[in-house]
Structures are given as structure tokens and as C-alpha cells.
Amino acid sequence: MKLGKVEFCHLLQIIALFLCLSGMNQAEPSRSRSKPYFQSGRTRTKRSWVWNQFFVLEEYMGSDPLYVGKLHSDVDKGDGSIKYILSGEGASSIFIIDENTGDIHATKRLDREEQAYYTLRAQAHDRLTNKPVEPESEFVIKIQDINDNEPKFLDGPYTAGVPEMSPVGTSVVQVTATDADDPTYGNSARVVYSILQGQPYFSVEPKTGIIKTALPNMDREAKDQYLLVIQAKDMVGQNGGLSGTTSVTVTLTDVNDNPPRFPRRSYQYNVPESLPLASVVARIKAADADVGPNAEMEYKIVDGDGLGVFKISVDKDTQEGIITIQKELDFEAKTSYTLRIEAANMHVDPRFLSLGPFSDMTTVKIIVEDVDEPPVFTSRLYSMVVSEAAKVGTIIGTVAAHDPDASNSPVRYSIDRNTDLERYFNIDANSGVITTAKSLDRETNAVHNITVLAMESQNPAQIGRGYVAITILDINDNAPEFAMEYETTVCENAQPGQIIQKISAIDKDDPPNGHQFYFSLTAEAANNHNFTLQDNKDNTATVLTRRNGFRRQEQSVFYLPIFIVDSGSPSLSSTNTLTIRVCDCDADGIAQTCNAEAYILPAGLSTGALIAILACVLTLLVLVLLIVTMRRRKKEPLIFDEERDIRENIVRYDDEGGGEEDTEAFDMAALRNLNIIRDTKTRRDVTPEIQFLSRPTFKSIPDNVIFREFIWERLKEADVDPCAPPYDSLQTYAFEGNGSVAESLSSLDSISSNSDQNYDYLSDWGPRFKRLADMYGSGPDCLYS
């Protein structure tokens, strides 16, 4: 099979491509015969394909399929018996072959940047048998590149920085553009760089894309940022080449090329003399056009009469010099100060020393203003002593204060009573002499810390404070006593001379040479036969037994008076009683029982007799309980004598709420008795504020009259009682509103006499309701007749 002839137009296109390709190697077509021949007993089959590679231009936009080339087999005699078959990459989809002629066409637009070549296979088949007449052969279709891709900056846009004042040619940044066209074919992918914007400050190397400074001494303080536009163009920058652009932002970084400078040669500030220590007097700042570390500076006072009075430090955030006060100001001593202050950069660049010096000086004058100051004591703390035996009015000491101002106003003194709540001391307002105002007790408070106030006579608001520590000197005014509450025991089997207790003493006083106590028994106890006392001469004493044979049954507790004397002048003494209990001890002398035991003597009764006595006692108790119970349960007869007085009570059934409070029983006989005067009954829910009116005694009159007077008397009491009316009474208000439909259900209307209700049936209810039937019945005697 061999490469066929091409059409004339296509041939011209191929010739033009070959002229553009310098040094391109193209394989010559080679022929091989399919006829085998034999040599030296060996058989070799020659290749029958004319093998080659085809070239086709990319981006073909014609309406007809693009002719690629022609395949031809030597077996093909041109009679149509041979059929050509194409397989491989893009076969049938991109490339098609004429099975009769072997012509290959491209049916789609090809892009070399997507795929640079296609590998295909071709074979000749017998049309009748569909069997290959030759082995399959492989060939390549290469896509010929055209300049259809512009250069692109894949990393753009760019940002870069370069120090200010850099020399010409200082590299800033390198930009790179890529072209997707074939770099091995022509100049389609050969890119050159140029600068479209940013001149004359910067330049770019055409081949490498390195951006460099083009002007010397660019000043950041004048302009700190530049925007560059860089172009990349293929075809070596020739006309007709494609191009792409990117932006580069170049920032000039700061260098220390500006020295600090004070805006003024001198400053003046006024401060009051009362300004506290560490207060800020002033803030000054030297201007520096640099930024960051290049603008950092330090301040120091290099000269002046305020070197020890003021100091200066740096505010790291604002780079200001902060002048603060170190010593208290006194207008009367000095009225002004002068300071020479230097500001200098901390990081100096040796390359720019010629622009210096990188420091500056200024003068600061501080004027001290007079302030009305409070009085000042001659001493911050006064220490005084006084004996606790000092009498009232004893002089303890003197304090002194003066007005530091030029006016020197008189000073008056007083004691801050918050520091002397008990008012133990007084002070003379004019002289400052401190005296005792009450008796002192060192044991209560050994040191008194008081505050003395000094005020100007002309301006009492100006107050100075002095502190006085008054120490109370001790005298021997407290007698010694036991150091603790002793619990002393002695065993019943104790032997004579046995130590049962060691005692010591304490004294609230504080003698200069320490305590020395002397112990002895009192005169009345010195000759006792039970115990003795031994003074150990070391502020302790030992209690010993004088005999043996202690018995709890005879005496369980002994009281031993001990006389203790101190060594003060004059000496004081006290008598302290030591309680000694007799105990039953074990073999080791450890107390087991110290309480007196009750010993029961034999009564001569047997156990059975004791049980019988106890049974009789229990029987008597049970009988007494039964008798009491029966008396309480004694029932009254069902039928009552009509003449017997009945104590009416309101009996509640199924009570769902609070009713009236008047549930007390009344003795009918008491109502008829002329000699009995009813006591005033007070309400339970309120406390009356006035006394009830006295009530007259009742005469012997009919029962209905008695009840009527009784009820009217109660109503009268309720009307005149200002505390609170009873639950069951008529209450008058300015406005009560509309009445309830159900009306009152909490009580009976005992005053109304116009009721239409017939209560005659109450007479049939028995003797219990006889009195109620008499009150509400229709008999001739009505309650309110």
C-alpha cells in the first residue's frame, strides 16, 4: 500500500507548511512487496504497505470534510475487489476512509492543544470473502499547529515590594506567561514581554519577564505604590502575534531615611504642685515620616534642673514621649523647671547616615502652680507611751503640724473618732497636746492607733492627717489564776505521797522580767489530812496525797483551796479551788468510775414476793383507769325535763366554709339570775382598742324580754365598737353596690319580725327545740312584741 497523489490545492497547502517547518524531518515512503521469495532455505514475507505519517492543519472550518491523504495497496488492481478498513483513535468518529479508493478525510474540527496526533490502523480486505489480503499496518496523523492561543499569565495578577531608594536595576518580581501552541513549530509559542504601564519607574526584560527598577531613589513618603501592566506577545512580538496582559502592584517598602524632628524648639506646661507622683505632666512627639520599626524612637532628658524630679518614657503605640513626675512638687521651694529632651531613632540604616543626624533636641519648661495645701505634720508617725494607771487628763504627748503655703494659716487639731471609738483620748485643738480621757487597761488593748486631723483655720476643708501609736505600759493589776480548768481524780487505792495533779498559773499582766508564781495551800487547808501541795519553783506546783484509803461511799469529792501569789510590785494573789474526785481505778491506776453508787441492802424478800407486789400495783392502776373512763362515758337520759335549762349550740353538719363566730353556749339560768352580770366577751380575730361599755344588770322578767334585751345589747356593742364589726352584723358603707340574688347564707336574720315563714313545726321536734319554738312560734308572746 502506498501514499496516493493529492489534489492540487491541498498539495499547495502542504508545500507551504513544509516551507514553514525548518529542519523538519519527514519519513520517505518505503515500499515492500507482498510477494514472498525464498533464500537459503528461509522464507521471508516482505511488507506490502506503503507506510507514512500524515499531517493535517488544526482549526479547519470548511464545510466539506478535510482531505488527509490516500492509502493504496499493491494488491489493489483497481477493479473494486479490494475494500479498505480503518480502525484506531478517531476512526469513524473523526476520520473516515473511502473503502474503494482509500482516501482519508477528517469530519470534525481538530485542535492540536486537545490532541496532537492520532494513531490509526488500516487493512485491505477482499470484498468477496471479507478476508484480509495483507497484514494490518499502523500509521499516524499529526495535527499541524497554527497560532490560535494567546499567552496567559497563570499566576497573575501579581503583588510585589521593593525597598524605597533602591538603585536602578533592582529586581522586583518575575512574571511568566505560557502559550498553549506548539513550541517546536514556528514562533507560535515564542513569547516576549513588554511594559504597557509603569514607565519610567520600572522596566521588564523581554525574554525573562523580570521587572526591575528604572529610576533611582524612589521615595516611599512621596508615593508608596505603583500599578504596572505587563504584556506577553507570541510570534516573537511580531505583527499578527497574539498577546495577553497582567497587572503588577509594586509597593515601596520603608527604609529609615527620615530622621526624627520636633515640630517646635520649645514647649511649656503648667502643673499644680499637688500633682500626685507618677502623674503625666506632658506628652511630646518628634515627627518621623518613616513607619514601623524605622519610626521607633527613644526619648531621654539630657540636661536641665529637673533631671531628678521628672522622667520621660515612650508610648510604644504612639511613639510619644511621656513626661511624668518622680518627686513631689513644692511651689514654695521651686516654681519652675527646665528640661532638655532628645529624641533619637532606635534603628539607624548606615546607608542613609548622610541624611542625618537621626536625632533631635527640644526644650521643655514646666511651671509649678501654687495650690492651697493641707497642713503637714512634722512627723508621719508619732510613738507615745502611757501607763495604764494614768489618771484621766494625764498628758501623753504632743503633735505638731504647719501650713506649708506662704500664708501659713493657723492649724487646729482633732482626733478622728473612727480610730478612737471608745474616746480614750483627747487633744487640745490649739496646742496638739494629747491627754487621757478615760481609764486605760493594757489587757484590753495594749496599743491604740489613732489618727490626728490638722485643719487650716481659714480653710477647714484642707485637712492633714498624722498617725499616733500609743502604747499602754503595764502595771500589776491582775491576780494569777489557774492556767486551765483542771479535772483531778484520785484513786481509791492511791498511796500516800502519790502525785495526782500538776498545776500552773497564768497572769494577764506582762512584767518586764517575766512571771514568777508562788503556790501554797490556804491556812484553813494547810493541815488537812488528805492532800498536800509542793511548789516546784518553776511556776508549777504538784498536788500529792497524804494518806490512803479513799472511799467514794464516804466522800466522793474533795475541794482543795490553793493560794497563788505573783512577783509583781505590789504583788497580787488569788485563791483557786481544785476539785478532786474519788474514782474506782483499774490495776494501772486508770479511773473507771467516779460517780457515787447507790448500794441496796438486802430486804429479806424473795423473788416471788417482789413479783406479787408488782402485780398488785399494776392491777390497782388498771382499775383506776377503768373508773375514770366509765365516768367520762356516762350517758344522759334521752328525754329531758322541760324545766331543765338547755345550753343551745350550733351544730354543724357538712360545713363547707366558715360560718359565724358566735358559737358559744349560754346558760339560761344565768340570763335569769339577777345577781350575775355578764362579762364582756371580746372577739377572737381582733384586739379591741377601747373598753366595752358597762352593762346594767337584768331584772327578773319573762324569757322573751330577756332574749330581746340580750340581743339588742349585743347589737349595740357591735355598733359602737370601732375596731371591727362582728361577722353577723349590718355594716354601713358609702356604697355597697347591688344586692346579691341569693342574699346572705351565713347567718339568720334574728332582728326581722315580718317573716312569713311558719315555725310551728318546731314544737313537734321534741324538748331540744322547745326554746326555739317559743322564740319563732306563732304564740301570743313574740320576741319583739
Swiss-Prot record:
Q: Which interval of the chain is the signal sequence?
A: 1-27
Q: Which gene codes for it?
A: CDH7
Which GO biological-process labels does this protein carry? adherens junction organization; calcium-dependent cell-cell adhesion via plasma membrane cell adhesion molecules; cartilage condensation; cell migration; cell morphogenesis; cell-cell adhesion mediated by cadherin; cell-cell junction assembly; chondroblast differentiation
Q: Which residues cross the membrane?
A: 608-628
Q: Glycosylation annotated at which residues?
A: N449, N530
Q: What is the native source organism of this protein?
A: Gallus gallus (Chicken)
Domain topic, free-text comment: Three calcium ions are usually bound at the interface of each cadherin domain and rigidify the connections, imparting a strong curvature to the full-length ectodomain.
Instruction: Spell out the molecular function terms from Gene Ontology.
Output: beta-catenin binding; cadherin binding; calcium ion binding
One GO CC term of this entry?
Answer: adherens junction
Membrane topology is: Single-pass type I membrane protein
Q: Pinpoint the Cadherin domain residues.
A: 49-153, 154-262, 263-377, 378-482, 482-599
Fetch the InterPro entries from UniProt: Cadherin, Cadherin-like_dom, Cadherin-like_sf, Cadherin_CS, Cadherin_Y-type_LIR, Catenin-bd_sf
Keywords (A to Z) from UniProt? Calcium, Cell adhesion, Cell membrane, Cleavage on pair of basic residues, Glycoprotein, Membrane, Metal-binding, Repeat, Signal, Transmembrane, Transmembrane helix
Name its cellular compartments: Cell membrane
Say what the protein does. Cadherins are calcium-dependent cell adhesion proteins. They preferentially interact with themselves in a homophilic manner in connecting cells; cadherins may thus contribute to the sorting of heterogeneous cell types.
Q: Which residues are propeptide?
A: 28-47
Extracellular domain ranges by topology: 48-607
Q: What is its main location?
A: membrane
| Pfam families membership | CADH_Y-type_LIR, Cadherin
Q: What name does this protein carry?
A: Cadherin-7
